[in-house]
Amino acid sequence: MTVVRDDPIRPDPGFAELYASLPDATDLWPWLELARAAAPPVLYLGIGAGRLAVPLEAAGIQLVGVDSHPGMLERLHQRLPNTELIQSRIEDLDLGRRFSMVMVPSNLLETVERLRHAAAHLAPAGLLAAELTNPYWLRAGASAGVRVQAFDGNGARFEVDYNLPDGRTVTQRAEVTLVWPDEVENWLATGAGLRLRRMFGRPDAELASSPSFYVVAGRG
């Protein structure tokens, strides 16, 4: 079994290889709808190897991409050579620019430090859109291919299996800080001075059973 880990401080080459091996996303909800409503470019934090970014660019969305993993950005640059890409952890990001939309898919914005740095890049009327791991889903035991190894309400450690097109199975080990849906409004306000505009689960699941949930927030 091949095991990889997302470590922004000590990037795992296998992690970039895994995501480069995954097929591009075909369902762009809700990111395409949100990005189309924003003035370009859209700041994409955690842009990765491009499985979502490439289809978004093909749909006409202009992106500025940030990722901490050099291997991810190297692969993405080969696919999107004209897209501005920046290597940085979210916690260290200071572009000196503001954006109409900051999007953070893939459950990366769970800490207050990351939230503050993302919010600092919002234009006055800009919106932050983020995907967060759903604690209710993890507490219920998650789903097939996901093994919850530790859960204490504030954080979780789990493994996710990916079955690749070439027949291999690669396991990603993950540790997350958890934000509960009923705490999001206060988390946004106290952490970054943001106001919750929308919160919703995936279209095929209620908020309490959705593997992740989505938050849209802005100032004022």
Whereabouts are the PLM-identified features?
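SAM-dependent methyltransferase
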Residues: 118, 125, 129-187
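A short acidic, Gly/Pro-enriched loop at the edge of an enzyme's catalytic core
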Residues: 92-101
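Conserved class I S-adenosyl-L-methionine
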Residues: 1-48
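Class I SAM-dependent methyltransferase SAM/SAH-binding core
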Residues: 49-92
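Residues lining the SAM
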Residues: 105-106
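C-terminal lobe and adjacent flexible extensions of AdoMet/dcAdoMet transferase-like proteins
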Residues: 181-220
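A short, conserved alpha-helix within the catalytic core of class I
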Residues: 110-118
